[in-house]
A protein has these predicted regions:
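Hydrophobic alpha-helical bundle cores within soluble ligand-binding/oligomerization subdomains
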Residues: 1-176
């Protein structure tokens, strides 16, 4: 909850905490990643735990986060002029579904996206987010599955939507 507050300027509700935890847990398995190598090297050299984590996090650059940032930009471009005020309320997104075809490569998973199925299953259970429902319906419409990065983007936009609409955060906060 504190991490979401730091980014969005408001605490999430129970559902917001649930989806934030799903997003964070998507990155727990670091097997074969440069971040794990940096953390292990830092740990072996006797650094404190916070230095170990800082070293690993410092490895995560814009290039690694770019697919999720692109998905956030795509979702934002689809919904930014909509009348959607509550990201967990009721909203008819048929118009956005029809407009989303140009973002197919950004929003749908490639064959090597191993986390996508598990994450989609978790997010589909008791889905309240308009953005997550939209993403799942778009994938179904296109005969694919949403990418992990697109689901991370949908979670982030769900958490930040009210703050964005009330101008507590900017579009840049959502897309960078």
């Amino acid at each position: 909850a504190n991490l979401v507050f730091a980014l969005c300027r408001e605490y999430p509700n129970e559902y917001g905490e649930k989806i934030a935890n799903i997003a964070l847990n998507a990155y727990v398995n670091q097997c074969g990643q440069a971040t794990l190598a940096a953390a292990e090297a830092s740990r072996e050299n006797g650094n404190s735990p916070n230095t170990v984590v800082s070293g690993a996090v410092a490895i995560v650059g814009k290039k690694m986060a770019e697919p999720a940032m692109d998905a956030a930009k795509a979702l934002l471009s689809l919904f930014q002029f909509s009348k959607l005020s509550d990201p967990t309320g009721n909203y008819d997104y048929k118009e956005e579904l029809n407009s989303a075809k140009s973002h197919k490569d950004t929003l749908l998973a490639a064959n090597d996206d191993t986390c996508a199925d598990k994450m989609a299953t978790c997010l589909a259970q008791d889905a309240q987010s308009i953005f997550i429902k939209f993403l799942l319906d778009f994938a179904k419409q296109e005969g694919g599955k949403p990418s992990t990065d697109a689901m991370i983007a949908a979670i982030w936009i769900t958490l930040g939507w009210v703050g964005l609409r009330s101008k507590k955060i900017t579009k840049g906060t959502i897309t960078r």
